[in-house]
Amino acid sequence: MVVEVGYAQAWDPENRVPWRPIYVEEARERDVAGLPYVVVCRAAGREAPLEVRLVSWRDHYVGVWVYDAQGRRTDDLDLRLLDDPTRLLRRYAVRRHYTGPEMAEFDEACPRITVELFPDGKGRREEEPQGERGRRYSTAPRVSDDERWCHRPAFGEWPLFSAREHGLTEPPVFESTELAAAAADCGLAPPTCWHPPRPAQPGPIGELFRPGVRVTDGYHPEMTVVEPRRIGTLRVPSGLLAVSGPDVDHKDGPHITVPVPPGEYVLEEAQASHTYYCEWERSEVTRTDTIAVRLLVSEAPAATWKMALRPDDDIRLFLENQISGFDTDGATGCFADAGAWEPLLALFDRGLIQGDPDLDPDVYEDISDSMYLLRTRDQASGGELAAFATTGDGTYPVWIGRSEAGEVVGVAVLLEGMPELLPEGGVTADA
């Protein structure tokens, strides 16, 4: 079988067309420079590609998408370049088994199998025989080292990963070809173009503390940010702020730490009001909810927000929109002085978990009428811990705000996901 190979700067998955076709020489130059490019493999007489490969060495990433004759994506393969430049980790793979030619691409009822692998030998295999809404069976995948890793081919020497899926029994013959340019190839790449996986990105975090801003959380169509509440202060004499779930195992210390100047910092709640019809009251009522908490390091505005990473996180392994943060199985998080972490955590356990009635009020204080629950204080160092309620168990990202000069100005935790901004001037997002 002859496989035609063409190159482009990007691939538009919605329209299944390349963006900005390039010659093989330019693709080779981009490969050497680590810049992203795509490889499109086609067969004569077939409209849909056999497979498309996105290469971006600067992002440690190679992705392979396989298409069937109907133009539906059947397989996704995510390869990662780590410390050994000669091999790639098979980080993530998903296979979709469409039940017939009439089933739409990515149909929720499509059976699928997903496999995640990690360089330390761990992994997870999930089977969904009835699709996303059916039962899910999770097991540890049994794969050898050769199955976990694959050789990194040189430019122009990559195999057709989908040869078996397309029924090829003999190695294909590759022929270089020039891809046809789409009519809209001028200007910037469409936002729908395939890009290397990115970890979760910040939304309008600073705006959540700005009165008058209109947002939606997806459930409430319109919410209006009100003046943030200030709930006391937190002392961090060690200069290292801990953000963690105080209710889980901490053998290795707090989940997240952020260096800050030693000092005492304001604790805030971001709040938003919304109006809805209450069946009990039989009238419109207005409710104000806390949507985020923040430790304010400086009054300077945040120029950027970035998700904090845990000590063992490897950003090269992150999937699209993957989060990191602190874990909780008791719907609780905290800001604390990492230098006094152990004694502060012991006081938290004695006061909230064990309910010790004899705790000195100088070291343990309940906080009422707030998402902040309590404060503990280490008398030896002066360091403090302030626990706050989350809206459930799981992992909560920690967002670090920095000034134009790169200094930390705030550390925030969103309690119910990332809201979206609504247009100004009283126009709804749907208008």
What is the predicted function of each stretch?
Residues 118-137, 368-418:
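C-terminal structured interaction module
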Residues 18-58, 422-424:
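N-terminal low-complexity, intrinsically disordered segments
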Residues 33-41, 61-67, 87-90, 113:
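A structural detector for short beta-strand units
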Residues 46-51, 70-75, 107-111, 120-123:
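A short glycine-rich beta-turn/N-cap micro-motif
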